[in-house]
């Protein structure tokens, strides 16, 4: 019946007649607008017919596509677009199913124009806000197809660009349609993100190719507008901007995989650009999630090539700086812990030459210079991220890094690799470099907070090591902490300026907190400066650092007492060069003379005591004439001019402690303290600094002297402590502990299980025993004094002392006066 009615136009359903009337005889004439208005009015008047209209239009479109009647295909899609824009009723869901079916048909076509047409219609549909969204609608096909279009490799460059842009627009439409509706398909699922994100990155990756084309000035705006790279970046920003807390991981993981698969970490330019887009697009409070993803990826690639790891670290550096302005959350120490762990692994790789700890057949050989580059990248990242942290977090990071530095010891095991270097030494150097990066620019008004005791102790104990490079790092770290006004660069060159006002120093009055700090730690600092000056392996950089440290202490932390102590310290350094008990080379002795001259010249002008300045100036002028090798201008140059004989230096060339004490004492300084020579006190860490070879053995001998007989002192032979005696002592102590533990267990068990009467009887017996012992003690201690007249015999035949009162005693005449 329906088939017969279909043959006669008058008997066909009205919606079919209205649909047929919108198609002209010649497709070139386009859509019949008057008939389209009638169809739209009918659809609005009878919404229940909308799904049938869509089904019929879909049927016609599929037929026209099969017959290659592309003009009618375009008309059908235009009609569908207008119906979608006009209708917002509940029945539109069924109509949308037909619409999506037609769009899918166009996207399946091999004709680029039809693919672009279908994409444009889908984008229009995506921009429509539906009143009642459908949760059963699936967009899997569209995600796959649009992603495929993003990777188009058409021979024609212009057509390829159009197809790629259509694919990007389609993905953007899918995101807009689904991302904010929880009832619809979850676009954040990994199976969707693994297609969408790489497709966008693929087009971003070819931005250089697009920019390499140089269009004419008139065509430039059009080309710029049609760039797939810019459209992909805009789509990626929109996608990430809509990401919620739980979706960040699914959005970031495909980025990491894409960079791995296409080896994009090594040039690192594109990777940095990608993560800058990510960090600026996501919500600030989610930034720490991206950092966590990067840290995890760095750990996962711990055995990858050094260039790959360096690229990840560079990206991490850029991302962390951006994240620090938002919310880094609990990842601060986690980030530094990961970076320091990677630093240790890199040191092991460089020493062993492989990722497995030993070189074997088939093992990937590591390039040492690449590992060095990676280590420098890690250190740079540590510094750049730390510079963005607030003061309190930066202090925590400083303490955290210092806790990772291996402690120096007398017997530091040497673990050598191909280069024969000490693993602990390299670790110390790299961690101190990291600490220097973190401390650079660190400003804290309270030095007690900036340099707490536990941190300062560990840092200064490291300063006593034999390695010259480590000592230099420690000095630079101290300078970074103490310099709070940016004066350190003004002391980078050691000189004896006649007027220090040209340096334009920023000087503030010493605060109460600084005074407390110096009272507590000044002697510790002076001792390490003194011992550092005596090191034979010092070079020019060490003396420059020592001069800078002395100068900064004088400017930042000095009061009158500190100034006096610093002058005493420098005069003691002059004595080291003069007496030369350490057998220092000529250069070191000349350097110490020059260091003392430069510092005393500075401190004399800071104190502004005319007589003090005059004495220092006179000695410097005398040295210029008779001994220029004792001044920094001749010593701290590329080719030092030294004296071959420094013995017998005349007193006119030396700064005299008595003279300085006299002139400063007249200006209110403590002259008594100035007269005292500086002598450093040896501490445990100083004894620790006595470097000994690994093969050196220490024999511990314990001598016990018997002091029981004052007339004859008998020396007990020395007991040699061997491995067996130590083992026996440990075993015996363990046995004693076991016995004590068993006794306690029995006591507890007795009080828990024994009846009350038994416990009471036991306690009573102990009380009576205690009383008897006390009585015995009292009888011994409270005994009458002996009688001067002798003893008497008791009734039992035993001699008994008889007590005579003092007033009845008779004393010899010589004892009475």
Curated annotation (Swiss-Prot):
Localization (cell): Cell membrane; Cytoplasm, Cytosol
GO CC terms of this entry: actin cytoskeleton; cytosol; plasma membrane
Modified residues (Phosphoserine): 212, 214, 216
Function description: Component of a complex required to localize phosphatidylinositol 4-kinase (PI4K) to the plasma membrane. The complex acts as a regulator of phosphatidylinositol 4-phosphate (PtdIns(4)P) synthesis. In the complex, EFR3B probably acts as the membrane-anchoring component. Also involved in responsiveness to G-protein-coupled receptors; it is however unclear whether this role is direct or indirect.
Source species, domain of life: Eukaryota
Membrane-topology descriptor: Lipid-anchor
Record's protein name: Protein EFR3 homolog B
Annotated keywords: Cell membrane, Cytoplasm, Lipoprotein, Membrane, Palmitate, Phosphoprotein
Subunit structure: Component of a phosphatidylinositol 4-kinase (PI4K) complex, composed of PI4KA, EFR3 (EFR3A or EFR3B), TTC7 (TTC7A or TTC7B) and HYCC (HYCC1 or HYCC2).
Stored PANTHER family: PROTEIN EFR3 HOMOLOG B, PROTEIN EFR3 HOMOLOG CMP44E
Modification(s) after translation: Palmitoylated at its N-terminus, anchoring the protein to the plasma membrane.
Gene name tied to this protein: EFR3B
GO biological process annotation, one example: protein localization to plasma membrane
Primary location class: membrane
A Pfam family recorded for this sequence: EFR3_ARM
Family under the similarity heading: Belongs to the EFR3 family.
């Amino acid at each position: 019946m329906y088939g017969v009615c279909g043959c006669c136009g008058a008997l066909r359903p009205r919606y079919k007649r209205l649909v047929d009337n919108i198609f002209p005889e010649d497709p070139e004439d386009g859509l019949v607008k008057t008939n389209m208005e009638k169809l739209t009015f009918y659809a609005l008047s009878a919404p229940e017919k909308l799904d049938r209209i869509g089904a019929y239009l879909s049927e016609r479109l599929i037929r026209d596509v099969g017959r290659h009647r592309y003009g009618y295909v375009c008309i059908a899609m235009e009609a569908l677009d207008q119906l979608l824009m006009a209708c917002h009723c509940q029945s539109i869901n069924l109509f949308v199913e037909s619409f999506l079916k037609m769009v899918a048909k166009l996207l399946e076509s091999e004709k680029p124009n039809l693919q672009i047409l279908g994409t444009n219609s889908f984008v229009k549909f995506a921009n429509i806000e539906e009143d009642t969204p459908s949760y059963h609608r699936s967009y899997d096909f569209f995600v796959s197809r649009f992603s495929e279009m993003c990777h188009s490799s058409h021979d024609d460059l212009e057509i390829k660009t159009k197809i790629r842009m259509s694919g990007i627009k389609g993905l953007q439409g899918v995101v807009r349609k689904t991302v904010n509706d929880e009832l619809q398909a979850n676009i954040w699922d990994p199976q969707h993100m693994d297609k969408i994100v790489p497709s966008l990155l693929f087009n971003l990756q070819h931005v250089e190719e697009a920019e390499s084309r140089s269009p004419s000035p008139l065509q430039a705006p059009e080309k710029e507008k049609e760039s797939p790279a810019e459209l992909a970046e805009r789509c990626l920003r929109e996608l990430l901007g809509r990401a919620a807390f739980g979706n960040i991981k699914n959005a970031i993981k495909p980025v990491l995989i894409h960079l791995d698969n296409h080896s994009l970490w090594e040039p690192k330019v594109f990777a940095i650009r990608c993560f800058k887009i990510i960090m600026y697009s996501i919500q600030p409070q989610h930034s720490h999630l991206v950092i966590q993803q990067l840290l995890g990826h760095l750990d996962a690639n711990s055995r990858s090539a050094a260039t790959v790891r360096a690229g990840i670290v560079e990206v991490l550096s850029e991302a962390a700086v951006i994240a620090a302005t938002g919310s880094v959350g609990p990842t601060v120490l986690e980030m530094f812990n990961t970076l320091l762990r990677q630093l240790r692994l890199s040191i092991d790789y460089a020493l062993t030459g492989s990722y497995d700890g030993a070189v074997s057949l088939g093992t990937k050989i590591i390039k040492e210079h690449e590992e060095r580059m990676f280590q420098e990248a890690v250190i740079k990242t540590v510094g750049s991220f730390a510079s963005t942290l607030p003061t309190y977090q930066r202090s925590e990071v400083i303490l955290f890094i210092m806790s990772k530095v291996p402690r120096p010891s007398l017997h530091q095991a040497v673990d050598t690799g191909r280069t024969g270097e000490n693993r602990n030494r390299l670790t110390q150097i790299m961690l101190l470099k990291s600490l220097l990066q973190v401390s650079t620019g660190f400003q804290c008004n309270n030095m007690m907070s900036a340099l707490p005791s536990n941190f300062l102790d560990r840092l200064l104990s490291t300063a006593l090591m034999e390695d010259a490079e480590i000592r230099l790092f420690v000095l630079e770290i101290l300078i970074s902490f103490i310099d709070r006004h940016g004066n350190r660069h003004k002391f980078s060159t050691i000189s004896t300026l006649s007027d220090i006002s040209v340096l334009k120093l920023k000087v503030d009055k010493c605060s109460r907190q600084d005074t407390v700090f110096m009272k507590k730690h000044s002697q510790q600092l002076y001792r390490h400066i003194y011992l550092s000056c005596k090191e034979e392996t010092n070079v020019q950089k060490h003396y420059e650092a020592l001069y800078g440290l002395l100068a900064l202490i004088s400017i930042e932390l000095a009061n009158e007492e500190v100034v006096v102590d610093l002058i005493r310290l420098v005069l003691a350094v002059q004595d080291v060069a003069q007496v030369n008990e350490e057998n220092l080379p000529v250069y070191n002795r000349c350097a110490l003379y020059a260091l003392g001259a430069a510092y005393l010249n500075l401190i004399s002008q800071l104190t502004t005591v005319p007589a003090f300045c005059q004495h220092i100036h006179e000695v410097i002028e005398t040295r210029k004439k008779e001994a220029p090798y004792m001044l920094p201008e001749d010593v701290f140059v590329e080719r030092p001019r030294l004296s071959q004989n420094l013995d017998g230096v005349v007193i006119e060339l030396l700064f005299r402690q008595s003279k300085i004490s006299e002139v400063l004492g007249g200006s209110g300084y403590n002259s008594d303290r100035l007269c005292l020579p500086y002598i450093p006190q040896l501490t445990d860490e100083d004894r620790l600094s006595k470097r000994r070879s690994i093969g050196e053995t220490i024999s511990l001998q314990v001598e016990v002297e018997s002091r029981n007989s004052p007339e004859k002192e008998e020396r007990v032979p020395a007991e040699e402590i061997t491995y067996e005696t130590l083992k026996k002592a440990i075993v015996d102590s363990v046995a004693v502990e076991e016995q004590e533990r068993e006794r306690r267990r029995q006591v507890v068990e007795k009080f828990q299980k024994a009846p009350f009467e038994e416990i009471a009887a036991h306690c009573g017996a102990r009380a009576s025993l205690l009383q008897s012992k006390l009585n015995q003690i009292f009888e011994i201690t409270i005994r009458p004094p002996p009688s001067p007249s002798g003893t008497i015999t008791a009734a039992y035949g035993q001699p008994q002392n008889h007590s005579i009162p003092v007033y009845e005693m008779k004393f010899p005449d010589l004892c009475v006066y």
